[in-house]
Amino acid sequence: MAAIRKKLVIVGDGACGKTCLLIVFSKDQFPEVYVPTVFENYVADIEVDGKQVELALWDTAGQEDYDRLRPLSYPDTDVILMCFSIDSPDSLENIPEKWTPEVKHFCPNVPIILVGNKKDLRNDEHTRRELAKMKQEPVKPTEGRDMANRIGAFGYMECSAKTKDGVREVFEMATRAALQARRGKKKSGCLVL
């Protein structure tokens, strides 16, 4: 039996951990060096609830220089991973300011999973000290959940690509959301207008 194919697009601020999350999930290795992304595609097989799903993973660049390029990734998307970094309250602020309006414009009705990346840094002393200098602190789980409710996300997950904690669960939730999203339409997904 052929695998079901679904397309996942990951968005969020530059350096918030999108590419690492995809690489750890698809290749099981953590890249130690930061390389800003233009577009990279991976395919990963995942089984959820007894269904084999071939997940096409579309990476995107969060930097503003790519704001005009990024929409090319959106057509026919089945699920969006919208990421912020737990060590960057500013990246959480950009979820309702930038990412939600962009995604809802290009991908109306596509389920969104809000993902808090870099969970391992929440209790990291160095991270806490650096944030304290700016009168900030790491994002709390309740703040992530509240934001997910505010933007109407399908769900909220936290993970650490570095420790692999929660990584698989993020993609399992995303796959379930993509499978449920076939609400009787022939072709769900995004339009570029």
UniProtKB/Swiss-Prot annotation:
There is a cross-link at residue 135 (Glycyl lysine isopeptide (Lys-Gly) (interchain with G-Cter in ubiquitin)). A motif (Effector region) lies at residues 34-42. The modification Cysteine methyl ester is found at residue 190. CDD domains: RhoA_like (cd01870). Its EC number is 3.6.5.2. InterPro entries: P-loop_NTPase, Small_GTP-bd, Small_GTPase, Small_GTPase_Rho. The keyword Membrane applies. Regulated by guanine nucleotide exchange factors (GEFs) which promote the exchange of bound GDP for free GTP, GTPase activating proteins (GAPs) which increase the GTP hydrolysis activity and GDP dissociation inhibitors which inhibit the dissociation of the nucleotide from the GTPase. Activated by GEFs such as ARHGEF2, ARHGEF3, ARHGEF28 and BCR. Inhibited by GAPs such as ARHGAP30. Inhibited by GDP dissociation inhibitors such as ARHGDIA. GO terms for biological process: actin cytoskeleton organization; apical junction assembly; cell junction assembly; cell migration; cellular response to chemokine; cleavage furrow formation; cytoplasmic microtubule organization; establishment of epithelial cell apical/basal polarity. It is a lipid-anchor. Its main location: membrane. Keywords: Cell cycle, Cell division, Cell membrane, Cell projection, Cytoplasm, Cytoskeleton, GTP-binding, Hydrolase, Isopeptide bond, Lipoprotein, Membrane, Methylation, Nucleotide-binding, Nucleus, Phosphoprotein, Prenylation, Proto-oncogene, Ubl conjugation. The modification Phosphoserine is found at residue 188. Residues 61-78 are annotated as: Switch II region. SUPFAM superfamilies: P-loop containing nucleoside triphosphate hydrolases (SSF52540). One of its GO terms (cellular component) is cytoplasmic side of plasma membrane. GTP binds at residues 12-19, 30-37, 59-63, 117-120, 160-162. NCBIfam families: small_GTP. Belongs to the small GTPase superfamily. Rho family. This is Transforming protein RhoA. It comes from Canis lupus familiaris.
